Amino acid sequence: MKFAASLDKTAIVLTVLVTVVFAVVVGGQYALIADAGRATPVYTTVGCLAIYGLAFAFRPAGYVVTAEEVVVSRPLWNVHIRRADLRRVAKLPARDLSASIRLFGVGGLFGYYGRYANTTLGRTTWYATRRDTPVLLETTSGKKYILTPNDPGGFVGALAA
């Protein structure tokens, strides 16, 4: 069963702002620097495109629940979480994510994904596109994942079936 994952307003605004800033920086450098021998615009362009491309490639695009696993669909390298390894699945109140600190990952450009920590949940791995529909998946090995389908109740129900 497929579950959509759309961006919240904060992620949309941040994605648009980063896109505009990168376009202005890259376009502005090429417009202002007439010296073709300088490599600075090339380095900046490559850096901006790498950041943007990697953020897009690893963003969560949706979720699929099968009989064997939960799949986090991404443009590059899907994430597979075996259902047999799940100890706990719970719909969380959004406030449980409010004090989270990003340890390594992305905090708004195409979503929220990577390693996060907070006092309520401890260390977690997020594959989220919004912060108002969190679902916690905890494995028997103690790994904790935060997913944010548009329909968290249906998602939890599909995993309970």
Regions inferred by a protein language model and the residue ranges of each:
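Hydrophobic/basic alpha-helical segments enriched in Actinobacteria
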Residues: 3, 82, 91-94, 150-152, ...
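Hydrophobic alpha-helical transmembrane segments
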Residues: 35-46
